[in-house]
Amino acid sequence: MNDKELQTIRSRCEKATGGKWTAYIEGRNIECGSSFIQTADNDLEIIGATIADYDFIAHARQDIITLLDEIERLRSKEA
């Protein structure tokens, strides 16, 4: 991937709701009627999502930034 592609990905992440995202799964974490993803601003409910989908989406907010930072760190070592 080139720097422009990585910056485009980082920009999408930065435009998303900030803060940690957490998946709350009915029957696993909560007993309130429906699963949701808690963000810093609002709760997100996704119709038709599986438990794996909720976990993936919630973790992507943090994981993608971590991966981009690691790519940047590794590239700076090569320079």
What kind of region is each of these model predictions?
Residues M1-D69, R73-A79:
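Extreme N-terminal leader/activation tails
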